[in-house]
Structure formats: C-alpha cells, structure tokens
C-alpha cells in the first residue's frame, strides 16, 4: 500500500529505500512512455485545430503524428529531451514518494485522521507533488524545450540549452510556467494518490477472493484508472503550462504553425478560449490519457514492486 500503513504487518522500508523505489519507478516509467509524451506536447503546442479539415494543421491524430514525426525526424525524435526527462523523473519520483510517505506518517501520528483516508491521500499527494515540482521544475522546462523543437535544432546538448536560455532569457526562464504547474499538480497528484487508494479498496471489495494472488496486476490496473481520472479533470492547466513554458521560443515553433505570445496564465486561458474554442483546452487529450494510464499505472506498479522487494530483504535480514 502506498502511504504510511499503521498495521503491524505494514512495510518497514527505510526512507532511503523509499527514495530509491521512487527514483527507479520514475526512470523505468519515463523510458517506456516518452513517445506518448512527445506527441502530447506537439499537440498541446499546436494552435491550429487537431483536424484533417484544417489545412494549416500539421498534426491531426496520434497515428498521423507518429508517422510524420518518424518520417521527418527519425525514431530518435520520440525520445527528444530524454536525458533531462530522465533527470526529472528520477528526482521527481524520489522527492514525491518520500514526501508522501513522510506526510501520511506525520498525519497519522500528529492528528486524529486516519492516514489511509481519501482526503488525507489527496492533500498529502498534492503537497508531495508540489515539493517535487519545486525541486525539478527547471529540468521540466528544459525537457519541454527539447521535445518542442523541430529541425534544425535550436539546442544541441543539455549544456548548450542551459547556456543559451540563460543568456537570451535570463534565470527566470527556468521557472516559466511554475504557477500553472503548481496549480495543476496539486489536484492532479492528489487525485492520483487518493483515486489509486480508493480503486484498490474497490478492487478488493469487488473481487475479495483474489487476495494477494494478482497484486501486481491490481496495482497496474488501479494506477492506470487513477491516471485517467486525474488527467481528465486537470488537463486544461497542463496545456496552459506547456504553452507558457515555450514563451520566448517562438522562432523554433514557426515550422509547426501559428505562434502566439502570452502574458500569463489568465491571458493564455483567454486566448485559447477566444481563438481555439472550448475544445482548445483539451488539445492532445487522447495521447495524454493513453500516456496517463500507462505512466501512472507503471509508476505505482514499479514503486510498489520495489518497496515489496526492499521489505522482503529487510525481513530476511532481521531473521538472521
């Protein structure tokens, strides 16, 4: 079970083991879902409608976008920005899961609330994600820039990107989109953790005979369901974040269609509504849901898997 478990037979992992499990979970998950992330970002940054009926639209579907990216940029394009993305995932996973475990334990020991309640998991999950976001946000901006650029490349290496961005846009560039990121990540991560816990309880209630026979499958399915629910409810804020993160990077976006500048979160929301309609808030939702189902499912699956491995190692060591 993710989060502090007061039961005597609960996992007894150290904080270091929790951080390692979170890091490895992030690393493996990122490698598997990177292509969906690249397609999602391309959709989010395209101002034209995602439709064949719009002659100016570069992308209009997942398969079409996949073929076009493959033809124009080669298979490595699906892992553009993968190094900063992996740094992001490893750091984010460690901070998020460690913070969540510590916060739920703090709630259990210092309040009257049960650490396993939906509301506790929602608040602790949201706060843990905010802590992780503040830690790794500069890397997220770098990842978005790498994934968003076409050919010819503006940034050749990670060091080149850091130097160019700092000289041309100043240090504040590394925290572009932070406000909508924090606003979006709190409910998104809160829903991930709380829905995951609730879906696991529902699964055990619906299929009590299963017990622990298919626990790994249960973790994967419940994680995927939690990912779809949380992503659907918070998607517009993710779109605003991506649009704001590429501000000042318009020259590299010219090959993808229209280019717009935004003054801030509210201006971005207003322009999207006026020029792209209400459906503009959900551009790229289909690859995002696919990505959310896979990434959240794998995230919880691998985290629980490695925590269980460490728990078994600790138990074996204590019995010697």
Swiss-Prot record:
It is found in: Mitochondrion membrane. The lineage of its organism: Eukaryota, Metazoa, Chordata, Craniata, Vertebrata. PANTHER family: SOLUTE CARRIER FAMILY 25. The chain crosses the membrane at residues 19-39, 87-107, 122-142, 173-193, 220-240, 293-313. InterPro entries: Mit_carrier (IPR002067), Mitochondrial_sb/sol_carrier (IPR018108), Mt_carrier_dom_sf (IPR023395). Belongs to the mitochondrial carrier (TC 2.A.29) family. This is Mitochondrial thiamine pyrophosphate carrier. The gene is SLC25A19. Mitochondrial transporter mediating uptake of thiamine diphosphate into mitochondria. It is not clear if the antiporter activity is affected by the membrane potential or by the proton electrochemical gradient. GO terms for biological process: thiamine diphosphate biosynthetic process; thiamine pyrophosphate transmembrane transport. The modification Phosphoserine is found at residue 51. It is a multi-pass membrane protein. It catalyses: thiamine phosphate(out) + thiamine diphosphate(in) = thiamine phosphate(in) + thiamine diphosphate(out). Pfam families: Mito_carr. It comes from Pongo abelii. GO terms for cellular component: mitochondrial inner membrane; mitochondrion. A motif (Substrate recognition) lies at residues 241-246. The keyword Transmembrane helix applies. Solcar repeats lie at residues 13-106, 116-202, 214-309.
